[in-house]
Regions:
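Flexible, low-complexity linker and terminal segments
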Residues: 4-223
Length: 223
């Protein structure tokens, strides 16, 4: 729900990462226990003046109007364009529109700073930290409890929550990234953000981790 509302407010696509186990599984949950989210209203055109789809704003989000509205022409252009959507090669205009996009990214990052972008399970200072995403979380939590380790699960990957992540990883000790893929996708992304997990535990035979299997492999890499 949060991803959809932010997508609507900031006029951007939202990608919700899933995996094979989640896609093929069936789960039950208490809908009443879900945290309610406030409606995020989009910046809509007020109906006055000439419509500029890419008008500069402080937040970087331009007023939205839908194609088919009377008196409105909505232009979508994949090339560098001006505020109305017409192609341009004027350097000042191109720079201004690029800076508008950067402001939008900054506004989104500022709003996400209030969102719990990183979840943790277990006590800080355990000396061992398991990083995971997706359906591996449940096996990781159980295996980590047996090993006396802590589990860290990033919930937002872009814009990456640098401050929350760095605060969470203080005193992490030995770190391993557990993933159900062959290339260590999350570990690679973390390295791009300046954090190297150092160890990876990968499984890519199309099956989820079993707790005993994961516990043995974590004990091996943490030894």
């Amino acid at each position: 729900a949060t991803a959809l509302m932010l997508s609507w407010k900031y006029q951007i696509p939202s990608i919700i990462l899933t995996d094979k186990t989640l896609a093929e599984g069936a789960y039950s949950f208490d809908i009443e226990a879900l945290t309610p989210h406030p409606d995020l209203e989009p910046a809509l055109r007020d109906g006055t003046g000439e419509y500029r789809r890419y008008a500069p704003t402080e937040s970087g989000v331009s007023p939205l109007a839908f194609p088919g509205r009377r008196g409105v022409v909505v232009k979508a252009n994949s090339y560098a364009h001006d505020e109305a959507g017409f192609t341009t090669e004027e350097s000042g205009v191109v720079m201004g529109l690029q800076e508008k996009l950067l402001r939008k990214g900054e506004s989104l990052a500022a709003e996400l700073a209030a969102y719990p972008a990183v979840k943790t399970y277990g006590a800080r200072g355990a000396g061992m930290t398991v990083i995971c995403w997706g359906s591996e979380k449940w096996a990781c939590i159980e295996a980590a409890e047996n090993l006396g380790a802590r589990v860290v699960q990033p919930l937002v990957l872009s814009p990456f929550p640098d401050r929350a992540w760095n605060e969470t990883m203080i005193g992490a000790g030995k770190v391993a990234c557990v993933e159900n893929n062959a290339t260590g996708q999350l570990a690679r992304l973390l390295r791009q953000q300046g954090f190297d997990p150092g160890r990876s535990v990968l499984k890519y035979d199309g099956r989820p981790f079993a707790v005993d299997e994961l516990k043995a492999r974590l004990a091996e890499v943490f030894a």
